Amino acid sequence: MRVILASKSERRNYLLKKIFPEFETVVPEIEETFRGNNPETIAILNARKKAIDAGKKVGDANCMIISADTIVVAGNKILGKPADKETARKYLTLLSGTKHRVITGICIFNPFDNRIFSDFDVTFVSFNTLTEQQIEAFLSKETFQDKAGGYAIQEINDEFIKEIQGSYDNVVGLPVEKLKQMIEQFNELQQVEIYDITLPDGSGVGKCDGKVVFVDNAVPGDRLWIKIVKNKSSYSYAINCGIINKSSIRVEPVCPHFGACGGCLLQNI
């Protein structure tokens, strides 16, 4: 199967070669989202948007599109890619002497059969207290551009970094071990037919492996790809990993935040 990296990042290109020596690249064109209270959800949403846009560019090809989106979170503040040197300076000053999170959302998508699976990885990075001179010396190299949080970990030395907890590759931009696990899970996704819906939560109801399965964002008549996330003795819970055949009663949501706030949960009934 063809493997396509939906990114122009040289860092992600280098890291993906640890899994696939040969692959193609497609550059997605999206507007990244930073609205919302959950940074993990934001990173996943941006990764999914990249994968889907790349899928539109390659058509219905039977391939595995891999995309990622990395954000830095300091306290409750999400730090994206700085637009200019002044913003990068503010970011580094904010990170100085603190522990922050580096979150990478990952998405795997096959436009041929509409399988889509996403997850995230998180690494905790602690910075030493930085002097103004250290920050200015780093900024003078002009390497802060296109880097979440204003820095690339492979371009700074021990005078910046105090401790890393978690995947180093994740901080670079693509957590290789996490991606390997996701590829295995992607290849094990199952199909299910939805025949009912629960109230008041609105989960779709189907059967898989002889047990009732409750699936998010599904309506009667849908045929879906699913991943089981919780098993009970007589039933299980699963996430929707792509619609194979749409139900005749399914409609496209008017609100782009459908399913996130719950206000329009019953729209598809």
What are these regions (language model features)?
Residues 2-4, 39-186:
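Anionic-ligand binding patches
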Residues 3-5, 25, 125, 194, ...:
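Generic preference for hydrophobic
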Residues 15-18, 35, 57:
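Short loop/helix-cap segments at secondary-structure boundaries that form the rim of catalytic
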Residues 23-34:
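A short beta-strand-loop structural module common to alpha/beta enzyme folds
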Residues 27, 74, 108-110, 208, ...:
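Residue-level signal for short segments within beta-strands and strand-turn junctions
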Residues 32-37, 74-76, 265:
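A short acidic, helix-capping loop that chelates divalent metal ions and anchors anionic groups
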